């Protein structure tokens, strides 16, 4: 009715002014009949849009048209993947790690547009964009590995990111090289090691030292049945390839054993889980004054709930991948940016990224989904603790661990589903201490202990590389 009244009003207005002018300068119409035609067209368009919206609300089916993500590196990687998909790959019984090795260069010296796109307020590379590129290149490598083996139709999904460790985040004065290759393959999953190093004139003469390393896990599934699909086996050749393959095998076995034992799901079934439960109860004892007698509580402590931050967004079609789902790298970037803001607000100074501790992808995100990102400081180490002792040159600097959860909201049925969970570790480079974060419930305390336990295990596994972060380089 609103649309009809608007059009009728325009007809009357034009009729009153017909002696002054035979045209309407705003609409460029010369007769009331043309207005009627425009109105009918407007009604048709409105009805079409309304039908589309209603269909979207009911079904949430994304378009099959593929769009290109605005990030220039990601766009180039997707174009490479599409070109590669049109080529015929010879059948292969197995592949070596070197077959999948892929590199892409950031030519910051010669490309001013690229330099501007990746520059942070501090003059370093924007780590959120780096996360997008890591996921995009890892996807290319995964597609390259499975090509020419087994089923022609399969879908590769990012299952997890184990850890992305940084030595530093460089300024944009020199070119950088992003590289990756498959390092371990199970039955239907593969692990891909990603690295970034600075380009210099002697890169061909010696092995460059990377400033970032991370491991992405991809799983191959049938797009119709969503069941795992067997992929091409990996045969390591060199001693280094064999060592990394063995490490990947150990990590895969540890994850499988943890799932069987129930570690991390709140069920104290083992001796380790019982110790974790005791540790959680101790955290609740520490939090008791804040919960019951806040005026007498430690002023250097704060409840976890008071560190929360949140934002929401609609998943747009411009950030979907080739499987018509929202690009995982984009979700990682949005989660990182919220985590950075939460740490900045908590610590009172510009934090510095130390590592991406863990990312799990529980469910895909569709175009049009309403996303809610929730962040909080899950725990802090005011004096750096045992983990902080491994921070290069700054053994006593406080560390802050941020958890970000991404929920897909469904207002039509008043439901929310957890899609992703992210963990980030930051360091406060000039602070001597920070407030201790304590849980407000036993459930939160258990999650804190689980995260602490995972971090301590990872620190022991990666000792000698993980958490060697040169703060003076920034």
Task: Cite the ranges covered by each PLM segment.
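HotDog/MaoC-like acyl-thioester-processing domains
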Residues: 43-85, 168-174, 183-269, 367, ...
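Active-site helix/loop of acyl-thioester processing domains in fatty-acid/polyketide metabolism
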Residues: 125-151, 327-349
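Extended repeat-based solenoid scaffolds, especially LRR ectodomains
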Residues: 259-304
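A cross-kingdom feature marking solvent-exposed beta-strand/loop segments within repeated
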Residues: 151-177, 202, 348-364, 369, ...
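N-terminal mitochondrial targeting presequence
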Residues: 1-64
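Short amphipathic
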Residues: 99-111, 305-316
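Eukaryotic modular interaction domains in large regulatory/scaffold proteins
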Residues: 309-360
């Amino acid at each position: 009715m609103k649309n009809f009244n608007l059009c009728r009003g325009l007809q009357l207005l034009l009729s009153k002014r017909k002696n002054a002018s035979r045209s309407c300068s705003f609409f460029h119409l010369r007769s009331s009949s043309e207005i009627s035609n425009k109105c009918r067209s407007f009604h048709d368009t409105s009805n079409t849009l309304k039908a589309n919206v209603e269909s979207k609300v009911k079904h949430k089916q994304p378009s099959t048209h593929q769009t290109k993500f605005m990030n220039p590196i990601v766009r180039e990687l997707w174009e490479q993947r599409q070109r590669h998909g049109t080529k015929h790959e010879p059948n292969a019984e197995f592949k070596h790690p070197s077959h999948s090795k892929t590199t892409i260069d950031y030519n910051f010296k010669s490309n001013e547009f690229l330099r501007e796109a990746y520059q942070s307020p501090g003059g370093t590379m924007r780590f959120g964009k780096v996360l997008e590129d890591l996921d995009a290149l890892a996807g290319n490598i995964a597609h390259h590995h499975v090509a020419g083996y087994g089923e022609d139709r399969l879908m590769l999904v990012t299952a997890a990111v184990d850890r992305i460790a940084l030595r530093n985040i460089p300024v944009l004065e020199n070119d950088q090289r992003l590289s990756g290759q498959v390092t371990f393959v199970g039955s239907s999953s593969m692990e891909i090691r990603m690295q970034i190093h600075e380009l210099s004139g002697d890169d061909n003469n010696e092995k460059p030292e990377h400033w970032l390393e991370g491991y992405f896990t991809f799983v191959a599934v049938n797009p119709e049945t969503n069941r795992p699909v067997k992929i091409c086996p990996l045969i390591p050749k060199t001693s280094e390839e064999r060592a990394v393959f063995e490490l990947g095998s150990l990590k895969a076995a540890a994850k499988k054993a943890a799932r069987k034992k129930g570690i991390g799901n709140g069920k104290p079934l083992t001796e380790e889980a019982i110790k974790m439960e005791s540790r959680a109860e101790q955290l609740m004892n520490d939090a008791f004054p804040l919960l019951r007698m806040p005026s007498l509580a430690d002023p250097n402590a704060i409840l976890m709930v008071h560190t929360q931050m949140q934002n929401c967004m609609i998943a747009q079609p411009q950030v979907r991948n080739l499987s018509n789902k929202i690009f995982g790298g984009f979700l990682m970037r949005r989660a990182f940016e919220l985590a950075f803001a939460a740490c900045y607000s908590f610590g009172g100074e510009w934090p510095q990224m130390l590592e991406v501790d863990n990312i799990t992808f529980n469910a895909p995100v569709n175009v049009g989904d309403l996303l809610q990102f929730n962040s909080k400081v899950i725990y802090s180490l005011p004096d750096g603790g045992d983990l902080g002792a491994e921070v290069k040159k700054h053994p006593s600097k406080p560390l802050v661990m941020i958890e970000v959860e991404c929920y897909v909201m469904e207002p039509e049925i008043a439901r929310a589903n957890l899609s992703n969970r992210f963990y980030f570790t930051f360091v406060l480079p000039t602070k001597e201490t920070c407030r201790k974060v304590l849980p407000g419930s036993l459930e939160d305390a258990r999650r804190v202990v689980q995260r602490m336990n995972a971090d301590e295990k990872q620190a022991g596994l990666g000792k000698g590389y993980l958490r060697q972060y040169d703060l003076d380089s920034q």
